[in-house]
Swiss-Prot record:
Keyword set includes Secreted: yes
Keyword Secreted carried by entry: yes
GO cellular component: extracellular region
Record keywords: Secreted
Protein name: Septenin 2a
Source domain of life: Eukaryota
Similarity section: Belongs to the Frog skin active peptide (FSAP) family. Septenin subfamily.
Organism: Osteopilus septentrionalis (Cuban treefrog)
Primary location class: secreted
Length: 23
């Protein structure tokens, strides 16, 4: 569960960076 939470946070951060990059 902890691992999934960390991976989820990393995925969310990557999504935010990706969206900013697209903008």
């Amino acid at each position: 569960i902890i691992g999934d939470t960390i991976n989820g946070a990393i995925a969310n951060a990557n999504n935010i960076v990706g969206k900013i990059g697209i903008i």
